[in-house]
């Protein structure tokens, strides 16, 4: 069969497998690639075996070492990038650093065990970092003879998901066996195809970066005599056009409004700048000293300056170049947001005495001056210019 060209017109979606250790996340990932390669042979659909996925290369994301396997495959409708983090610690780091932005995930639960401690932790983390759509794959059903037991496990999983504000009663639960599908058992291969069509239907297509409201972290500011003030940086999301009204947010309590009178890239005038572009934006009615690095240009009303938030953080281990000693309540490091460091104090959860290097923990942060943040904003925790932790904003408090 002739291999067709990679079709860019298919929507692209990022997903991953999550769940307790040894419940079959990697086996399921292998089964999906293998069954799709058999049933829908294309140049993209290549079978990956367990060993090649499990031997995930080490990556460094914001100074943190993470093992993650990236595989790709496609269904009739979509192209998928799928991440599988082999170890529990890798999964936690992946979620918190934003190394793996997932639009949705497949929660793998072994029917022989039911939900386990990491099942719970992964569901909580998904909720905290904004993975809104989960599908459940109950694995290893071939090892359970008792139909009632499977029903009990399914109820238990649904209750657990509801506890963390997922639609536990309504979200899809598919029962199958990744290993049997991998071995070529047709009944279980059909279930993998059913799982993939469920993923196609249930996980919505992500909003493209260019469709989101403008956010441009300011890296540099200069003035052009006779023309005004230019703020430059890389557009994080959205678009910016001449005559757009924008807001300058962060560092100061007040939000300042401005009008865009020019957009330049590589010294050329543009009609518009798009997400990913490095641009200079000429602003009318803004003095050189009224805007600075660390602020953002944003679509009016889309983001506000805040000083207090809850965050989910991972603290680097000594081996990763992090701290050698624990820290305690009221620890005051710098928080690096996009382009700038801001000092802040950390309040630990009740009952947590200290945080050791290599731990992950929920913290409350109070910054000394406001920064444009929202749920899902990532940050680094630094001490004297070196990264000692990585986090993501889970809730805005003030």
Swiss-Prot record:
One of its GO terms (cellular component) is cytosol. Its main location: cytoplasm. Residues 63-67 are annotated as: G2. This is Elongation factor Tu. It comes from Streptococcus agalactiae serotype V (strain ATCC BAA-611 / 2603 V/R). Coiled coil: none annotated. Residues 10-207 form the tr-type G domain. The gene is tuf. GTP hydrolase that promotes the GTP-dependent binding of aminoacyl-tRNA to the A-site of ribosomes during protein biosynthesis. The lineage of its organism: Bacteria, Bacillati, Bacillota, Bacilli, Lactobacillales. Residues 19-26 are annotated as: G1. Residues 177-179 are annotated as: G5. The keyword Repeat does not apply.
């Amino acid at each position: 069969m002739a291999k067709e060209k990679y079709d860019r017109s298919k929507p692209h979606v990022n997903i991953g497998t999550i769940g307790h250790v040894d419940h079959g996340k990697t086996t399921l990932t292998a089964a999906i690639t293998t069954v799709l390669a058999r049933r829908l042979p294309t140049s993209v659909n290549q079978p990956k075996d367990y060993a090649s996925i499990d031997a995930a290369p080490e990556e460094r994301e914001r100074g943190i070492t993470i093992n993650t396997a990236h595989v790709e495959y496609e269904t009739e409708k979509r192209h998928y990038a799928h991440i599988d983090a082999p170890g529990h610690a890798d999964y936690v780091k992946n979620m918190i650093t934003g190394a793996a932005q997932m639009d949705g995930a497949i929660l793998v639960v072994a029917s022989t065990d039911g939900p386990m401690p990491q099942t719970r932790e992964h569901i909580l983390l998904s909720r905290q970092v904004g993975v809104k759509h989960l599908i459940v794959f109950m694995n290893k059903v071939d090892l359970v003879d008792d139909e009632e037991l499977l029903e009990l496990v399914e109820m238990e999983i649904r209750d657990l998901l509801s506890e963390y504000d997922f639609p536990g009663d309504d979200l899809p639960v598919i029962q199958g066996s990744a290993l049997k599908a991998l071995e070529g058992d047709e009944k279980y291969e059909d279930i993998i195809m059913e799982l993939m069509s469920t993923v196609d239907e249930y996980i919505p297509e992500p909003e493209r970066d260019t469709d989101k409201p403008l956010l441009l972290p300011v890296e540099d500011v200069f003035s052009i005599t006779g023309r005004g003030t230019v703020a430059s940086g890389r557009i994080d999301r959205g678009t910016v056009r001449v005559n757009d009204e924008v807001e300058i947010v962060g560092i100061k309590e007040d939000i300042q409004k401005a009008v865009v009178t020019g957009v330049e890239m590589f010294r050329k005038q543009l009609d518009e700048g798009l997400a990913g572009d490095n641009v200079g934006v000429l602003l009318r009615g803004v003095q050189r000293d009224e805007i600075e690095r660390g602020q953002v240009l944003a679509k009016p009303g889309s983001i506000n300056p805040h000083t207090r938030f809850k965050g989910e953080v991972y603290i680097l281990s000594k081996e990763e170049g992090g701290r050698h000693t624990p820290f305690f309540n009221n620890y005051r490091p710098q928080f690096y947001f996009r382009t700038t460091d801001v000092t802040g104090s950390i309040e630990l959860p009740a009952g947590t005495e200290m945080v050791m290097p290599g731990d992950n923990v929920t913290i409350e942060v109070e910054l000394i001056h406001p920064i444009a943040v929202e749920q899902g904003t990532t940050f680094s925790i630094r001490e004297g210019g070196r990264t000692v932790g990585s986090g993501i904003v889970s809730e805005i408090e003030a």
